[in-house]
Amino acid sequence: MNDKETDKEADTMEGFDRGEDIAVMEPLQVSDGSPHQGALTELAVDLAAKSAGFRRSLPDSVVNALADLVRAMNCYYSNLIEGHDTHPVDIERAMQNDYSDNPRKRDLQLEARAHVTVQKWIDEDGLAGRAATLEGICEIHKRFGELLPDELLRVQDPQTGERIRVEPGTLRRRDVIVGDHLAVSPGAVPRFLGRFEQVFSRLGKAQTIASAAAAHHRLLWIHPFLDGNGRVARLMSYAMLRDALDTGGIWSIARGLARQEAQYKRQLIACDQPRRGDLDGRGSRSEAALAEFTRFFLQTCIRARAPTSL
């Protein structure tokens, strides 16, 4: 799976809980009273209108063909974000069971096939209504991981050199540090995912569109799996927006995120930061940073809604 910045082990004691309060993850949404809310609502409405118009403008036969293209495109760009440059031709060959004799290239082809397969399952309503649930998030990870070669299910402890196997669909039992972010302790992960599900799985369509960016970041912030969190977050976001916007699977945000990768990652890091004083919301994390990421995310969706080529 290999997120581009490999998850780093911070402690080998498995399953411990530091007792973190779920309040340290707040806010989970940009508040109604935020000075940013008006502009974000306008972007969400614009996205909904343009997505619906684009979907209605195409006959079903074109929608089906375009959905196949988007799955390959989404896979290609999601791979780029992970640091895996799998050529579109190799992705197409993988879908035809035509694999390279080069072991590394073959592994990346299998990874690409896994991504396309899981997204097709989402497009066929396999995750309908469950994208932001603990069950759904674990199922994305499980379905993806079970299709990967063993080599891509291994992460290395930078302190001991130990090669640790990632168990598909299983929440991590170890501490991890990604960049400067120490994720919540492994014993706290179910508690934080419970709060995540409580907030994001019960939203109406309009609220889902407006909150998809926040869900994307907060899942990465929790970092529920030993590896593969970036892919799961992008597939979850794809599924949430597909349900809320009835996209027909004909556009995806992954291309836009990959083309602005540096900004995407800067925005995610900014959302990790604590509140910047009394005018920055009422939660532990910066509401202004979350609002800025939401703006970036929605604008990226608007630009990405009409894919024509890789």
Model-derived segments and their meaning:
Residues 1-310:
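FIC/Doc superfamily catalytic core
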